[in-house]
């Protein structure tokens, strides 16, 4: 199995390094990751400037100022030959649950892999300690995929409780929960008296029902949420069409 491995925490982050070491025991792994933390970069792609890469002695490649999406795009289309069999993103330092997937560079890297035609996993740890647990879970899933491919055409968003492996209760297939809207902005002043602003933490849980990713992780289970790229709200199409007809938009300007 040939794996393109990326993340949004940066090439030196403990999550990606722990996972790379574990994956290399049974797979051919090429790391292509940002040279710095690009958390929250979502699906952004660098179009207005060129991208430089740096290759380390162990073969890992850092993309200078690159986003997670840049890294997977370059990895698939230029840097990994032969091309990968699968794209894996992670292990992220912290969860990507519910609405987090909108902003997540970790999920975006997997999404780019799927967009380019490859199976893709995004892996996040609900904390900053037991990366070995998340690595073991990921390896188990990938070994299973080797034996029997999962032909859903979907991204698997995997969130792992920050627990020792022997305390993980199992795996649940879940849906995305949701958070309350975030509203915290933290102002500061620089030495010249100019105001600086920091984006605050995400909102608290809003929908954390028993079938959600939030609930699974809170209860000690690995959460696997299948994600797809199509953002169309199919069940709203008729409602919008009826509304347009009723208000006359499209027949008079």
From Swiss-Prot:
Keywords: Cytoplasm, Hydrolase, Metal-binding, Nucleotide-binding. A divalent metal cation binds at residues 8-9, 39, 92. Its main location: cytoplasm. One of its GO terms (molecular function) is nucleotide binding. Its cofactor is a divalent metal cation. Its EC number is 3.1.3.5, 3.1.3.6, 3.6.1.11. One of its GO terms (cellular component) is cytoplasm. It holds the Pfam family SurE. Gene3D superfamilies: Survival protein SurE-like phosphatase/nucleotidase. InterPro entries: SurE, SurE-like_Pase/nucleotidase, SurE-like_sf. It is found in: Cytoplasm. It catalyses: a ribonucleoside 5'-phosphate + H2O = a ribonucleoside + phosphate; a ribonucleoside 3'-phosphate + H2O = a ribonucleoside + phosphate; [phosphate](n) + H2O = [phosphate](n-1) + phosphate + H(+). Binds 1 divalent metal cation per subunit. Nucleotidase with a broad substrate specificity as it can dephosphorylate various ribo- and deoxyribonucleoside 5'-monophosphates and ribonucleoside 3'-monophosphates with highest affinity to 3'-AMP. Also hydrolyzes polyphosphate (exopolyphosphatase activity) with the preference for short-chain-length substrates (P20-25). Might be involved in the regulation of dNTP and NTP pools, and in the turnover of 3'-mononucleotides produced by numerous intracellular RNases (T1, T2, and F) during the degradation of various RNAs. Belongs to the SurE nucleotidase family. PANTHER family: 5'-NUCLEOTIDASE SURE, 5'_3'-NUCLEOTIDASE SURE. This is 5'/3'-nucleotidase SurE. It comes from Escherichia fergusonii (strain ATCC 35469 / DSM 13698 / CCUG 18766 / IAM 14443 / JCM 21226 / LMG 7866 / NBRC 102419 / NCTC 12128 / CDC 0568-73).
